[in-house]
């Protein structure tokens, strides 16, 4: 998202850089349907799911960006940034940034399947990042930025594989997104939660996240 270097991510260890993906958006009807549904615009980060909700765990680069995308969708009840897929228990952000923990930055989404389906969340996932770049999103490089879908059950696994096959027809390069079981999700530090919502005028938010959201918004208006 955005050309060139993005501003540094406050005083934390990992700089964020993104380039706007120069490819046409697809699945516009799905996105239009989502925006037409009534829903809340501000979400909490309480990830206690109920018997009416389900969880999806997705990694598509910087979790600030992915979180901001899903917080705005009707049917999404809560979004939490965190880490998954590695071997280090209770990792810190600084540890994950080294690339040595095996963890990816991920977003865990609590959603009401009667309002938005898992398949629709996946449709947005393919639009919100470039799944053809290995261990990289724009200028963010490292295994912690890998494209990954962590499934919670066999139904999610099947849906993810089917969605990936369909999405592959839309990209000129092979999709490198991993589809793996979720073993443990670690919630990220508090300052990561609702980052865009709470820091919309921060340099990274203005240079990277806002253009990404505007791009998705334009897709729903055509």
Predicted regions and their residues:
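Extreme N-terminal basic, low-complexity initiation segments
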Residues: 2-9
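Flexible coil/turn and secondary-structure edge motifs
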Residues: 22, 36-222
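Hydrophobic alpha-helical segments of integral membrane proteins
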Residues: 28, 34-37
């Amino acid at each position: 998202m955005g050309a060139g270097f993005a501003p540094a991510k406050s005083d934390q260890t990992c700089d964020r850089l993104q380039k706007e993906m120069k490819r046409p958006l697809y699945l516009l009807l799905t996105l239009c349907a989502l925006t037409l549904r009534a829903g809340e615009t501000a979400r909490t980060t309480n990830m206690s799911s109920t018997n009416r909700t389900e969880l999806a765990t997705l990694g598509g680069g910087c979790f600030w960006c992915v979180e901001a995308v899903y917080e705005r969708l009707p049917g999404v009840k809560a979004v939490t940034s965190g880490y998954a897929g590695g071997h280090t228990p209770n990792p810190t952000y600084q540890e994950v940034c080294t690339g040595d923990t095996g963890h990816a930055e991920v977003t865990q989404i609590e959603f009401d399947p009667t309002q938005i389906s898992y398949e629709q969340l996946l449709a947005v996932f393919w639009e919100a990042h470039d799944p053809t770049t290995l261990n990289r999103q724009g200028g963010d490089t490292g295994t912690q930025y890998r494209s990954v879908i962590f499934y919670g059950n066999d139904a999610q696994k099947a849906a993810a594989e089917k969605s990936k096959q369909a999405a592959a027809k839309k990209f000129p390069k092979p999709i490198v997104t991993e589809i793996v079981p979720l073993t443990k999700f670690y919630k990220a530090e508090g300052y990561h939660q609702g980052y865009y919502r709470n820091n919309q005028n921060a340099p990274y938010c203005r240079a990277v996240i806002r253009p990404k959201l505007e791009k998705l918004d334009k897709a729903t208006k055509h």
